[in-house]
Structures are given as structure tokens and as C-alpha cells.
Amino acid sequence: MAPKMKAAMKAMKAPAMKGKAMTKTGLAEAWRRRPSFLRRTAGQSWRAWPRSCAAEVKKTGKLTIPGLVMVKTRKKPATKAGKREMFGKVVLVKASCQDVVKAYPVKALKTDF
């Protein structure tokens, strides 16, 4: 592996965990606590799911949906600031870092296929 690649991989690190990852029961409770959520209405649960999952990923940096998928966030290092020519004009580019969100299949899902 090239030295630049190794340095880039070392620079990528998981964000600091602010809390404990939500369990299956915690996820069900988050759905139940949503305003105007009724057990009989399946449509509302599907609308509440993305909001609950997004909030959990923002809070802890990862979320596991048992038997399906694990979502993780990674911090990518900042790109270098500088000047670049675009269409004959000099453009100033700011240094920017990113939080990358990736989803991985869980082992139980891999073995089923």
C-alpha cells in the first residue's frame, strides 16, 4: 500500500461516541414515543423510522438495525484550501471536511443470500 494511502487511512477515524448505540428495544420505544403514533397505523411507523434512525446516527455515530444493516459515520480529513482555475478564472477553494455515512449489511443478512 502506498504511504499516502496509509496516511489517509490513519487520518480517517470514527467520530467520538457521545452515547451508547440504540438497541432493538430502544428503537421500538423511539417509534412508540412519536406524537400521534398509533399501533394500528403502519404507515406512520414507516414515516417515523427515518427520523428516529437519522437522530440516532447523528447522536452516536452508528446504528444497527438487527438482522438487516449497520450504519456508521466516518470523519474524512479536510481537503487542502487553495486556488484553482475554472474556465479561465481563478477560484478560491475553502478547506472542507466531511462526515461520510456508510451502510453495511449485517452477517445474518449476508448468510441468507
Curated annotation (Swiss-Prot):
> Can the keyword Nucleus be found in this entry's annotation?
yes
Which GO cellular component terms are attached? nucleus
The alphabetical list of record keywords is: DNA-binding, Nucleus
Q: What is this protein called?
A: Major basic nuclear protein 1
Q: Where is this region: Disordered?
A: 1-20
According to its UniProt entry, this protein's organism is Crypthecodinium cohnii (Dinoflagellate)
**Which compartments is it annotated to reside in?**
Nucleus
Q: Has keyword NAD?
A: no
Return one GO MF term: DNA binding
Q: Which InterPro entries has this protein been placed in?
A: IHF-like_DNA-bd_dom_sf
Q: Which branch of life, at top level?
A: Eukaryota
